[in-house]
Amino acid sequence: MLMIIDKLNYIYNPGNAYEKHALKDINLVINEGDFIGLIGHTGSGKSTLTQHLNGLLRATSGSIYYRGQDIYADNYNMKELRSKVGLVFQYPEHQLFETTVYKDVSFGPRNLGLEPLEVDLRTYEAIKMVGLSDEILDVSPFELSGGQKRRVAIAGVLAMKPELLILDEPTAGLDPKGRDEILEQIAKLHRQNHITIILVSHSMEDIAK
């Protein structure tokens, strides 16, 4: 088992008038190679749950185990967890900031202190994994279409070589063509690269695809 979530609870603003119980006794087992669809209406706690899986939020109570280790243990390496559990936020293209696609996709591997050759390899592999040509590596990400920007943002997470990839509303704001292309690319990632994926959506149609 890759990850176990056991009786997870999370309360926003505990103890005051704005207290909200966002997650209540959540239990989930994630196995390697799973493709999990997480569906619910806006405000149902989907994003709150996913932000627990790579340690961005800490549970009010309950436990999370990654490869058998308690991520809330005092000596647990949270930085390593975040390199293994890749989280692509909603509208990830808003986080693009570099002058070229190459610099954006390679940002994570460069910050790991990897050798330049390994950084290059990861960057080229990640771009191909999202169905883009390496010819765009020297292009500014801001010259790309919305769907292409989204793929570049996903490639930046894939370049970190995560064992678990979480995509939060990956089709949000895209036109029908862009939505279909992104969903097909995600399905292909799972089929061809055997990456464990959690796809978060409010759309049953997206999950069904």
Regions found by a protein language model. Give the residues of each.
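Helix-to-loop junction immediately C-terminal to a conserved catalytic motif
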Residues: 54
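Conserved catalytic motifs of ABC-family nucleotide-binding domains
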Residues: 161
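Catalytic Walker B motif of ABC-type/P-loop ATPase nucleotide-binding domains
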Residues: 165-168
